[in-house]
Amino acid sequence: MERKKIAFVIYSLESGGAERVITELANNLIFDYDITIITLVKTVPFYELNPRIKLLFCSETIKNDTTLIKSLSDGFKRIKTLVRYIKENRIQLVISFMTSSNIYSIWASKLSRIPCIVSERANHDIYKLPKLLEVIRDVSYKFCKYLVVQTEANKAFYSKKLSSSKILVIPNPIAESLSNKRNHELKTSKNIILNVGSFKKGKAQDLLIRAFSEIENKDWLVFFVGDGPTKQENINLTKKLKIEKKIKFVGKQQDIEKYYNEARLFIFTSEHEGFPNALLEALYFGIPTISTNCKHGPADLIRDKENGFLIPVGNQNVLQKKMSQLMNDIVLQNKFSENAMKSTAKYKITSIVKLWENYITKLI
Protein backbone atom coordinates (compact mmCIF):
# COMPACT_ATOMS: atom_id res chain seq x y z
CA MET A 1 0.00 0.00 0.00
CA GLU A 2 1.30 3.44 -0.95
CA ARG A 3 2.37 5.54 2.00
CA LYS A 4 0.62 8.81 2.84
CA LYS A 5 2.54 11.96 1.98
CA ILE A 6 3.04 14.86 4.41
CA ALA A 7 4.85 18.16 3.87
CA PHE A 8 6.15 20.27 6.74
CA VAL A 9 6.59 23.99 6.03
CA ILE A 10 8.73 26.43 8.04
CA TYR A 11 10.78 29.56 7.38
CA SER A 12 14.14 27.79 7.78
CA LEU A 13 15.84 24.86 9.48
CA GLU A 14 18.38 26.88 11.41
CA SER A 15 18.85 26.52 15.18
CA GLY A 16 15.64 27.14 17.14
CA GLY A 17 12.82 25.56 19.08
CA ALA A 18 10.29 25.28 16.24
CA GLU A 19 12.99 24.01 13.89
CA ARG A 20 14.02 21.31 16.37
CA VAL A 21 10.43 20.15 16.88
CA ILE A 22 9.71 19.93 13.14
CA THR A 23 12.94 17.98 12.65
CA GLU A 24 12.12 15.52 15.43
CA LEU A 25 8.53 15.06 14.25
CA ALA A 26 9.71 14.44 10.69
CA ASN A 27 12.42 12.02 11.84
CA ASN A 28 9.85 9.98 13.76
CA LEU A 29 7.03 10.11 11.19
CA ILE A 30 9.30 9.05 8.29
CA PHE A 31 8.88 5.40 9.32
CA ASP A 32 5.15 5.49 8.47
CA TYR A 33 4.82 8.37 5.99
CA ASP A 34 6.66 9.93 3.06
CA ILE A 35 7.93 13.22 4.49
CA THR A 36 8.95 16.42 2.69
CA ILE A 37 10.16 19.55 4.47
CA ILE A 38 9.72 22.83 2.58
CA THR A 39 11.51 25.92 3.86
CA LEU A 40 10.69 29.44 2.71
CA VAL A 41 14.41 30.23 2.47
CA LYS A 42 17.31 27.92 1.63
CA THR A 43 19.33 26.92 4.69
CA VAL A 44 21.59 24.12 5.83
CA PRO A 45 19.66 22.11 8.48
CA PHE A 46 21.08 22.68 11.97
CA TYR A 47 19.61 19.45 13.36
CA GLU A 48 20.27 16.01 11.90
CA LEU A 49 17.62 14.93 9.40
CA ASN A 50 16.83 11.36 8.37
CA PRO A 51 18.28 11.04 4.83
CA ARG A 52 14.92 9.72 3.57
CA ILE A 53 13.30 13.11 4.21
CA LYS A 54 13.02 15.23 1.06
CA LEU A 55 14.13 18.85 1.51
CA LEU A 56 12.86 21.69 -0.72
CA PHE A 57 12.98 25.49 -0.50
CA CYS A 58 10.97 28.35 -1.97
CA SER A 59 13.81 30.83 -2.56
CA GLU A 60 17.53 31.33 -1.97
CA THR A 61 16.93 34.34 0.28
CA ILE A 62 14.07 36.51 1.50
CA LYS A 63 14.43 40.29 1.41
CA ASN A 64 12.65 42.27 4.09
CA ASP A 65 11.00 44.70 1.71
CA THR A 66 9.21 47.64 3.24
CA THR A 67 6.69 48.22 0.46
CA LEU A 68 3.33 46.56 0.93
CA ILE A 69 2.93 45.79 -2.78
CA LYS A 70 6.33 44.05 -2.97
CA SER A 71 5.62 42.05 0.19
CA LEU A 72 2.25 40.91 -1.16
CA SER A 73 3.80 40.05 -4.52
CA ASP A 74 6.49 37.94 -2.85
CA GLY A 75 3.83 36.27 -0.71
CA PHE A 76 1.83 35.23 -3.76
CA LYS A 77 5.01 33.83 -5.34
CA ARG A 78 5.66 31.69 -2.26
CA ILE A 79 2.09 30.40 -2.30
CA LYS A 80 2.47 29.56 -6.00
CA THR A 81 5.73 27.70 -5.29
CA LEU A 82 4.11 25.76 -2.45
CA VAL A 83 1.19 24.78 -4.71
CA ARG A 84 3.67 23.51 -7.31
CA TYR A 85 5.58 21.45 -4.73
CA ILE A 86 2.33 20.03 -3.33
CA LYS A 87 1.22 18.88 -6.78
CA GLU A 88 4.62 17.59 -7.92
CA ASN A 89 5.09 15.53 -4.75
CA ARG A 90 1.41 14.52 -4.43
CA ILE A 91 1.29 15.87 -0.88
CA GLN A 92 -1.88 14.93 1.04
CA LEU A 93 -1.40 17.01 4.20
CA VAL A 94 0.55 20.17 5.01
CA ILE A 95 1.78 20.89 8.55
CA SER A 96 3.21 24.37 9.03
CA PHE A 97 4.99 26.14 11.90
CA MET A 98 5.19 29.92 12.53
CA THR A 99 2.87 32.71 11.40
CA SER A 100 4.14 33.66 7.92
CA SER A 101 4.65 30.03 6.89
CA ASN A 102 1.20 29.22 8.24
CA ILE A 103 -0.52 31.88 6.16
CA TYR A 104 1.20 30.76 2.94
CA SER A 105 0.55 27.09 3.72
CA ILE A 106 -3.16 27.56 4.40
CA TRP A 107 -3.80 29.26 1.06
CA ALA A 108 -1.54 26.88 -0.87
CA SER A 109 -3.38 23.93 0.69
CA LYS A 110 -6.76 25.46 -0.05
CA LEU A 111 -5.81 25.98 -3.69
CA SER A 112 -4.54 22.38 -3.78
CA ARG A 113 -7.68 21.08 -2.05
CA ILE A 114 -5.83 19.31 0.75
CA PRO A 115 -6.01 19.82 4.55
CA CYS A 116 -3.59 21.95 6.52
CA ILE A 117 -2.55 21.94 10.20
CA VAL A 118 -0.76 25.06 11.46
CA SER A 119 1.17 25.63 14.66
CA GLU A 120 1.81 28.89 16.51
CA ARG A 121 4.88 28.95 18.75
CA ALA A 122 5.15 32.55 19.97
CA ASN A 123 3.98 34.29 23.15
CA HIS A 124 1.48 36.79 21.75
CA ASP A 125 1.59 38.94 24.86
CA ILE A 126 5.13 39.86 23.83
CA TYR A 127 5.44 39.41 20.07
CA LYS A 128 2.87 41.73 18.52
CA LEU A 129 2.15 41.52 14.80
CA PRO A 130 1.55 44.57 12.60
CA LYS A 131 -2.20 45.16 12.45
CA LEU A 132 -2.58 44.17 8.79
CA LEU A 133 -0.66 40.92 9.28
CA GLU A 134 -2.75 40.17 12.36
CA VAL A 135 -5.94 40.55 10.31
CA ILE A 136 -4.55 38.35 7.50
CA ARG A 137 -3.53 35.73 10.07
CA ASP A 138 -6.93 35.69 11.77
CA VAL A 139 -8.79 35.38 8.46
CA SER A 140 -6.42 32.69 7.17
CA TYR A 141 -6.60 30.56 10.31
CA LYS A 142 -10.33 30.09 9.84
CA PHE A 143 -9.45 27.83 6.88
CA CYS A 144 -6.99 25.50 8.64
CA LYS A 145 -8.18 22.13 9.91
CA TYR A 146 -6.39 22.47 13.26
CA LEU A 147 -4.33 25.09 15.04
CA VAL A 148 -1.70 23.59 17.37
CA VAL A 149 -0.40 25.65 20.30
CA GLN A 150 1.97 24.71 23.11
CA THR A 151 0.16 25.98 26.20
CA GLU A 152 -3.33 26.43 27.63
CA ALA A 153 -2.71 30.20 27.78
CA ASN A 154 -2.14 30.29 24.01
CA LYS A 155 -5.29 28.23 23.49
CA ALA A 156 -7.24 30.81 25.49
CA PHE A 157 -5.79 33.57 23.29
CA TYR A 158 -6.88 31.90 20.04
CA SER A 159 -10.22 30.72 21.39
CA LYS A 160 -11.36 34.33 21.01
CA LYS A 161 -10.74 34.01 17.28
CA LEU A 162 -11.47 30.35 16.43
CA SER A 163 -13.69 27.52 17.57
CA SER A 164 -12.06 25.78 20.53
CA SER A 165 -12.60 22.43 18.80
CA LYS A 166 -10.03 23.46 16.16
CA ILE A 167 -7.35 24.39 18.71
CA LEU A 168 -5.08 21.64 20.03
CA VAL A 169 -2.59 21.92 22.87
CA ILE A 170 0.48 19.84 22.03
CA PRO A 171 3.63 20.83 23.95
CA ASN A 172 7.20 20.54 22.78
CA PRO A 173 8.86 17.17 23.31
CA ILE A 174 12.00 16.73 25.34
CA ALA A 175 14.91 16.98 22.91
CA GLU A 176 15.78 13.54 21.54
CA SER A 177 19.44 14.35 22.06
CA LEU A 178 18.77 14.35 25.82
CA SER A 179 16.63 11.22 25.99
CA ASN A 180 18.12 8.41 28.06
CA LYS A 181 20.98 10.63 29.27
CA ARG A 182 19.60 11.13 32.77
CA ASN A 183 22.18 9.82 35.27
CA HIS A 184 21.99 10.76 38.94
CA GLU A 185 25.26 8.97 39.60
CA LEU A 186 27.01 11.98 38.04
CA LYS A 187 25.98 14.23 40.93
CA THR A 188 29.16 15.74 42.38
CA SER A 189 30.02 16.70 45.93
CA LYS A 190 29.58 20.33 44.87
CA ASN A 191 26.27 22.06 45.41
CA ILE A 192 25.49 23.53 42.00
CA ILE A 193 22.61 25.83 41.08
CA LEU A 194 21.96 25.81 37.32
CA ASN A 195 20.38 28.29 34.92
CA VAL A 196 20.14 27.49 31.20
CA GLY A 197 19.10 30.00 28.55
CA SER A 198 20.12 32.84 26.27
CA PHE A 199 21.31 36.05 27.85
CA LYS A 200 18.83 38.58 26.54
CA LYS A 201 16.16 40.96 27.74
CA GLY A 202 13.36 39.08 29.46
CA LYS A 203 15.49 36.18 30.72
CA ALA A 204 16.31 38.14 33.91
CA GLN A 205 19.35 36.16 35.03
CA ASP A 206 20.27 39.15 37.21
CA LEU A 207 17.38 38.18 39.51
CA LEU A 208 19.16 34.93 40.39
CA ILE A 209 22.51 36.70 40.84
CA ARG A 210 21.03 39.28 43.22
CA ALA A 211 19.09 36.66 45.20
CA PHE A 212 22.13 34.40 45.48
CA SER A 213 24.26 37.27 46.78
CA GLU A 214 21.83 37.84 49.67
CA ILE A 215 21.62 34.29 51.05
CA GLU A 216 23.99 31.97 52.88
CA ASN A 217 25.80 30.36 49.96
CA LYS A 218 29.31 29.38 51.10
CA ASP A 219 28.98 25.79 49.86
CA TRP A 220 27.15 26.61 46.61
CA LEU A 221 28.09 27.63 43.08
CA VAL A 222 25.89 29.01 40.29
CA PHE A 223 26.45 27.88 36.69
CA PHE A 224 24.97 29.86 33.79
CA VAL A 225 24.83 27.96 30.49
CA GLY A 226 24.19 30.17 27.49
CA ASP A 227 25.35 33.25 25.61
CA GLY A 228 23.77 36.47 24.44
CA PRO A 229 23.80 40.27 24.49
CA THR A 230 23.21 40.72 28.25
CA LYS A 231 25.87 38.24 29.36
CA GLN A 232 28.58 40.82 30.01
CA GLU A 233 26.36 43.03 32.15
CA ASN A 234 25.53 39.99 34.27
CA ILE A 235 29.24 39.20 34.61
CA ASN A 236 29.80 42.81 35.69
CA LEU A 237 27.01 42.46 38.27
CA THR A 238 28.74 39.48 39.91
CA LYS A 239 31.89 41.58 40.26
CA LYS A 240 29.96 44.50 41.70
CA LEU A 241 28.37 42.19 44.28
CA LYS A 242 31.76 40.54 44.94
CA ILE A 243 30.52 37.01 44.19
CA GLU A 244 32.34 36.43 40.88
CA LYS A 245 34.18 33.43 42.33
CA LYS A 246 30.84 31.78 43.07
CA ILE A 247 29.32 32.33 39.61
CA LYS A 248 30.46 30.44 36.51
CA PHE A 249 29.53 31.57 32.99
CA VAL A 250 30.27 28.56 30.77
CA GLY A 251 28.70 29.72 27.50
CA LYS A 252 26.61 27.61 25.14
CA GLN A 253 27.29 23.89 25.58
CA GLN A 254 26.76 20.92 23.26
CA ASP A 255 26.93 18.42 26.13
CA ILE A 256 24.21 20.15 28.14
CA GLU A 257 23.22 16.85 29.80
CA LYS A 258 26.46 17.01 31.83
CA TYR A 259 25.25 20.18 33.53
CA TYR A 260 21.71 18.90 34.06
CA ASN A 261 23.04 15.70 35.63
CA GLU A 262 25.38 17.52 38.02
CA ALA A 263 23.01 20.28 39.18
CA ARG A 264 21.40 20.22 42.63
CA LEU A 265 18.93 23.03 41.90
CA PHE A 266 17.56 24.71 38.78
CA ILE A 267 16.41 28.34 38.85
CA PHE A 268 14.34 29.73 35.96
CA THR A 269 13.92 33.52 36.05
CA SER A 270 12.23 34.44 32.74
CA GLU A 271 9.73 37.28 32.52
CA HIS A 272 8.01 35.69 29.51
CA GLU A 273 8.30 32.56 27.35
CA GLY A 274 6.78 30.90 24.30
CA PHE A 275 7.42 27.46 25.77
CA PRO A 276 10.22 27.00 28.34
CA ASN A 277 12.27 24.14 26.89
CA ALA A 278 15.10 24.50 29.42
CA LEU A 279 12.60 24.26 32.28
CA LEU A 280 11.12 21.08 30.80
CA GLU A 281 14.59 19.61 30.40
CA ALA A 282 15.53 20.41 34.00
CA LEU A 283 12.38 18.68 35.26
CA TYR A 284 13.12 15.68 33.02
CA PHE A 285 16.54 15.39 34.67
CA GLY A 286 14.87 15.49 38.08
CA ILE A 287 16.43 18.75 39.25
CA PRO A 288 14.56 20.43 42.15
CA THR A 289 13.33 23.61 40.48
CA ILE A 290 12.16 27.14 41.21
CA SER A 291 10.56 29.05 38.33
CA THR A 292 8.89 32.38 37.81
CA ASN A 293 5.23 31.97 36.95
CA CYS A 294 5.57 33.88 33.70
CA LYS A 295 3.46 33.69 30.57
CA HIS A 296 3.57 31.12 29.04
CA GLY A 297 4.51 27.61 30.09
CA PRO A 298 5.83 27.28 33.66
CA ALA A 299 2.35 26.77 35.11
CA ASP A 300 1.77 24.01 32.54
CA LEU A 301 4.91 22.22 33.71
CA ILE A 302 5.11 22.89 37.45
CA ARG A 303 2.52 22.06 40.09
CA ASP A 304 3.52 24.44 42.87
CA LYS A 305 4.95 22.68 45.93
CA GLU A 306 4.62 19.28 44.21
CA ASN A 307 7.35 19.12 41.57
CA GLY A 308 8.81 22.60 42.09
CA PHE A 309 8.11 26.13 43.27
CA LEU A 310 6.36 28.81 41.21
CA ILE A 311 7.15 32.38 42.25
CA PRO A 312 5.95 35.81 41.06
CA VAL A 313 7.87 37.28 38.14
CA GLY A 314 10.71 39.54 39.28
CA ASN A 315 10.20 38.96 43.02
CA GLN A 316 13.68 38.71 44.51
CA ASN A 317 12.50 38.36 48.12
CA VAL A 318 10.34 35.33 47.36
CA LEU A 319 13.12 33.79 45.27
CA GLN A 320 15.58 34.20 48.15
CA LYS A 321 13.20 32.53 50.60
CA LYS A 322 12.44 29.60 48.29
CA MET A 323 16.10 29.13 47.43
CA SER A 324 17.10 29.07 51.11
CA GLN A 325 14.31 26.64 51.89
CA LEU A 326 15.19 24.25 49.08
CA MET A 327 18.97 24.47 49.56
CA ASN A 328 18.58 23.37 53.18
CA ASP A 329 15.86 20.71 52.85
CA ILE A 330 17.09 17.41 51.40
CA VAL A 331 13.70 15.75 51.89
CA LEU A 332 12.00 18.45 49.82
CA GLN A 333 14.71 18.21 47.17
CA ASN A 334 14.09 14.48 46.84
CA LYS A 335 10.32 14.98 46.66
CA PHE A 336 10.61 17.59 43.90
CA SER A 337 13.14 15.46 42.02
CA GLU A 338 11.00 12.33 42.02
CA ASN A 339 7.81 14.18 41.10
CA ALA A 340 9.57 16.18 38.38
CA MET A 341 10.75 13.04 36.60
CA LYS A 342 7.27 11.51 36.80
CA SER A 343 5.63 14.67 35.49
CA THR A 344 7.73 14.77 32.32
CA ALA A 345 6.98 11.24 31.08
CA LYS A 346 4.25 12.62 28.79
CA TYR A 347 6.76 14.91 27.06
CA LYS A 348 8.85 12.12 25.56
CA ILE A 349 9.04 12.33 21.77
CA THR A 350 7.10 9.07 21.32
CA SER A 351 4.20 10.47 23.36
CA ILE A 352 4.20 13.80 21.50
CA VAL A 353 4.30 12.07 18.09
CA LYS A 354 1.25 10.00 19.10
CA LEU A 355 -0.64 13.21 19.91
CA TRP A 356 0.15 14.57 16.45
CA GLU A 357 -0.74 11.27 14.76
CA ASN A 358 -4.15 11.23 16.46
CA TYR A 359 -5.09 14.21 14.29
CA ILE A 360 -3.03 13.39 11.21
CA THR A 361 -4.92 10.11 10.80
CA LYS A 362 -8.23 11.97 10.95
CA LEU A 363 -7.26 14.00 7.90
CA ILE A 364 -5.48 11.53 5.59
Regions found by a protein language model. Name each.
Residues 252, 271:
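Aromatic "clamp/platform" in nucleotide-sugar-dependent glycosyltransferases that forms part
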Residues 288-292:
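Short hydrophobic beta-strand element within catalytic cores of glycosyltransferases
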Residues 303-305, 309-316, 325-330, 345:
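Conserved acidic donor-binding segment of nucleotide-sugar-dependent glycosyltransferases
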Residues 19-24, 191, 195-214, 229-235, ...:
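A conserved mid-protein helix/loop that constitutes part of the nucleotide-sugar donor-binding site
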Residues 8-16, 20, 24, 28-70, ...:
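N-terminal strand-loop element at the rim of the active site
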Residues 96-102, 120:
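Short His-centered aromatic/hydrophobic patch
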